Amino acid sequence: MSGRGGRRRGPGQDSGSGQPSPSLSRGGGSRRGRGRVPSGPPPYSSYTPPRPQVAPTQPPPPSAPSTSTAPAYHPLSSSGAESLMREVSQKLTLEPESATTAPLLPPSSSKAIRSAQRPGVGRDGEKCKVRANHFLVKFADKDLHHYDVSITPEVTSKKTNRIIMQQLTDLYKQSHLGGRCPAYDGRKGLYAAGALPFESKEFFVKIIDEDQGRGSSSSATKEWQYKVAVKLVSKPDLHYLREFLLRRHFEAPQETIQVLDVVLRAKPSENYTVVGRSFFHPDLGPKGELGNGIDYWMGYYQSLRPTQMGLSLNIDVSARSFYEPLLVTDFVTKHFKRTSLKRPLSDQDCVKLTTALKGVKVRLIHMAYAKTCKIVGISRLPISELTFTLDDKKTNVSVVQYFLEKYEIVLKHPSLPALQSGSEAKPIYLPMELCQIVEGQRYTKKLNDQQVRALLKATCKRPPDRERDIRRMVSNNNFNGEERVSEFGIHVGQELALVEARVLPAPVLKYHDTGPEKSVKPSKGAWNMINKKMVNGGEVDNWTCVNFSSNYANISNDFCTRLVEMCNNKGMVFRHTAAVPIRSAHPFRIDQTLRDVYEESTRQKRPLKLLIIILPDQSGSYGKIKRICETELGIVSQCCQPKQASKYYPQYFENLALKINVKVGGRNTVLNDAIEKTIPLVSDDPTIIFGADVTHPQPGEDSSPSIAAVVASIDWPEVTKYRGIVSAQPHREEIIQDLYKTVQDPQKGVVPSGMIRELLISFYKSTRRKPLRIIFYRDGVSEGQFSQVLLYEMDAIRKACASIQDNYMPPVTFVVVQKRHRTRLFPTDTASTDKSGNIVAGTVVDTIICHPTEFDFYLNSHAGIMGTSKPTHYHVLYDENKFTADNFQVLTNNLCYTYARCTRSVSIVPPAYYAHLVAFRARYYIEDETSDSGSANARRNARDRNVEAQPLPSIRENVKEVMFYC
């Protein structure tokens, strides 16, 4: 478990205990609204932010050019920026488009797009040394050759492909391969450190089929013959790679890097279970049980990357869930926590078991030879009622009778269904008690809460322990002793990279002038609210509380009294008496109770500004409550865990007050530099900061849409309030589809629309200023998607701006935010260590392990709590604002102290974090339609993935006006 900036209950939830967590996990999507300075009493602070004025629905084009000192938009002179702008200008269309938006297609070529070049390295902050889990890779000048491999009949399994190619190498290494030992990638690529004695050749290889004919009753060993065609394709250039690493070229030779990567992965791929870029095996570390028939295995992640120090091998320890190699009957016992299998499985259990076991390989233990089968389902009837026709096509026999007569086996569990192999047309029925799950199969389904806790407990390692395990993995792998690695002239260093880092200072945070402490400078990523008042307290006039807890049914009045008192003490204006009576209700009546409260407040003409909810004792109701409140009734809600609510801890009430304040339009704190307008570039001109994320369904949810979320700051110069928008899009589509679009209006015809346009207009309504700079933090993008995402989404941003006003093209800085990387930073001395043993908050690295030429950096902006902290990787893909390294690194670090839900700096810049929270919230709005309940929707297969996503339920307007997702 990585070090986190605070405990969390689950992404997007606003209930829980202790300090709300600033750490980030992934999931879902939703919408977000404009915050407002509350009406009523004057602000508590001598600093008063600009109040929104009455504005037209759309901002009118100004009659004269802006008097701002911001330079007019000009493309950068670098060839990278020019090439992108050529692509964008070709796609930019100012005339209205067809109302039917065509699906985005991949560009014909994105090679012309080049990421922003590094504008020098940062110098701000106190220097220190850290170690990184990167190992220097040296390589000799070799004559690399890339060959294409074609195997007939076609094989889809990489494991089988590797067995075939290993057999080919063993048979023909000396006679036909010139004594060379080529490296194979498991698919189409074969690489040699020198020419093979041919340009094109066919080989024939025989291997034993581990499935023994897939259903044949013959005990004879069965062999399969494959034809392998090998043909020369190219000669990757190591010289060009050296030139790139020396920064004499800007385009990374990916093919050459891939060759060396395949060589380093060849031996582990043959010996271990491969999952993406990671390897797992029981010998790589301790394994343990997660429960329900699932184990965890330890392993390691490995990736070869170009860095400033040269090629770097990134190694990190990892853990994954695997099926226990059990008899299927034992798996059923563990999975359903049964003590006996005498009772038949229910229909619901059968659906769950099918989901858990579909695609799993089992070994038949009653056979005299090793035979494996793949499970395609389970029978509808118990095995005692199943019959089939023998091979003579005349005799019909029961499965129970067949096993008794054929194998002299009396089945012990005839009431259980049979496992089904083969096909629907010709099923093969297998008794569960005679099938053992084959070892080494990854469990890809969603882990339950108990399993997640067990996995985190087993894998959460303090920095010294994680560093030790990484060193052990590298030593045990003995890369330099492997035949192919030596043949290719590759040498892997044994020491972690020593990197020069800097610790950026924490920003000064402004609080209310009426509090004893008017500002604070956080220490080691944390501070508290003692003697401080919120810089802008929100107003809550109409509120009430509903308690759905049975175990804590009598706490409602005392709890609300203490919560209201805390909110008022911290600077809010919170009415002491509820608008409608506080009540308790049964959790089975959530829907009706919420509607009753809404109708009662409406009848009394006291519409609720806040509904406090004490959740049921059993989990599972949170999403339902949020969906009803936000999409049906139009009520902002604050949910509380009953166990925590009953303890009356002041810290818990303080945390709730922080969340409630921003939900009703207030601000908790702002950067002092923002008030004094001393943030470089951002304070100079009206600047809007976006955060964007796309979250995808859990594995196995083939019919669920992906959800895109975009948030944007709507206050300037404070940059603390973020309005959010969400949109459903096709399953696992990464590019955000609705950043810009056109729609058909009944009166106006085709009109421009989309997320960016709506948020730009919201900024104008709130500040009466056009944004003259755009900063776009984009989360959730892998390196392979950089070019496409930049091309499409920059194009959408440009079109959205142009749709508001001709020639309106504010300069854009487009930044990818990555948490799903495997770089870890370890302190080298106690002076640069926090109490968790991690590097301190504010540690930034932009040398040695970063890209040779592009503008990227690692920032550890949060204080670790447990485990090893994971820095966030920021990669600036496009920068028309011309930030210096220091300016952008300091801005990003300082923003991490403005997260509204806690008094800790967070691990990821808040706009991206908020986008994640908004997206996760929207997942609750549709979970009833896409839940894994055995419904037709849940069983829909991959052929439905590209259908148009259904629109999300609309969030009520009054809810969208505030940061309801906090």
Region locations from a protein language model:
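Long, low-complexity, intrinsically disordered terminal regions
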Residues: 2-966
